[in-house]
Amino acid sequence: MRSNSILALSVLFFAATKAWDNTPPIPERVEGLGEGSGNLRIDFEVHYDLMCSASAALYPDFATFLDTPFLNGKVRDAVTVRYVFQPLTYHHATWIPHKLLPFIVDQCVANSTSCQYINYMNFCFNNQDDILGSTDKSFNQIVQNWTAKVAKQFGWNQKDLTDLFDYDTDTHNSEMRTRYMWKYSTSRGVTSTPSTFVNGIMVQNFPGSPDEWMQLLKDTYAGQQNGASFASHQFLQ
């Protein structure tokens, strides 16, 4: 009888600990992909919504900034960039273009030389009207139209893309991974797009020109130099 009581208490304890285990799902890899060599170990994490007009309008300035001469090369040689996406529900049907991203990430992981992650971002920015202007169409119609357009642009099989929208045929865990995108961005305190972080710190005012991006980089780099000078001074004391 005593052993039965101990067994029952053990089962109850195990059940209680499982009930209180609130560890969230852990994504299989760091959210987002990007570019840059990172020679100076300065990291830019940029959050966009593929259907956000401000994201589309301001991205070209950031692209120009990356190709701007800096030190002995270009900005992209000095920094690393990671593009992260936050599908904001007030942008009509924004979930649809974002749900293709897990498929694209997997393509990039399998073959980094043919990665279309950044090209797809550009494609979405340039074709926002196809999604945002489809208020007279059903969800399935938008999926069919968008996947046909994307498949033609990138040479992918349209069925591979439409399969992402059916739980029984999706092999990329697309729904959950799209939720991870939103959850990650939200957990970082992002409430609107575009937003950016430099070395993990959120920038309060998103830069509005290549010059503003460059000033942000120079300020960060100057901090590195001041830190190095301080460390050298301390070492020599």
Give residue spans per PLM region:
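A short beta-strand-turn-helix
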Residues: 20-44
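Cleavable N-terminal signal peptides of Sec/SRP-targeted secreted and luminal proteins
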Residues: 3-18
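Proline-rich low-complexity regions
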Residues: 24-27, 53, 87-88, 194
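C-terminal cap of thioredoxin/glutaredoxin-like
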Residues: 20, 42-49, 59-67, 143-237
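Short, flexible, glycine/charge-rich loop motifs used to bind or transfer phosphoryl groups or to couple energy/partner
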Residues: 32-35, 71-72, 185-187
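Structural alpha/beta surface segment adjacent to cysteine/selenocysteine redox centers
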Residues: 40, 45-148, 188
